[in-house]
Amino acid sequence: ARDGYIAKPHNCVYECFGAFSSYCNGVCTKNGAKSGYCQILGTYGNGCWCIALPDNVPIRIPGKCHR
């Protein structure tokens, strides 16, 4: 497991809009992470950051987000 921005297909982050929103924690835990939160103005803008996300779940990597 590792910490990181959980990625949608095509290397895009799950966008979020509030540091205290429960949205990211839900997205992260649903995918097997210990927890998650909305990182505001992070490397990829406002995106969900997951703690202890399983290795088989994709994380955002450098490069373009292909929508």
Curated annotation (Swiss-Prot):
One of its GO terms (cellular component) is extracellular region. The keyword Secreted applies. Its main location: secreted. Residues 67 form a propeptide. Coiled coil: none annotated. Expressed by the venom gland. Keywords: Disulfide bond, Ion channel impairing toxin, Neurotoxin, Secreted, Toxin, Voltage-gated sodium channel impairing toxin. It is found in: Secreted. The keyword Transcription regulation does not apply. InterPro entries: LCN-type_CS_alpha_beta_dom, Scorpion_toxin-like, Scorpion_toxin-like_sf, Scorpion_toxinL, Scorpion_toxinL/defensin. SMART domains: Knot1. Residues 2-66 form the LCN-type CS-alpha/beta domain. Alpha toxins bind voltage-independently at site-3 of sodium channels (Nav) and inhibit the inactivation of the activated channels, thereby blocking neuronal transmission. Belongs to the long (4 C-C) scorpion toxin superfamily. Sodium channel inhibitor family. Alpha subfamily. Has the structural arrangement of an alpha-helix connected to antiparallel beta-sheets by disulfide bonds (CS-alpha/beta). This is Sodium channel neurotoxin MeuNaTxalpha-8. It comes from Mesobuthus eupeus.
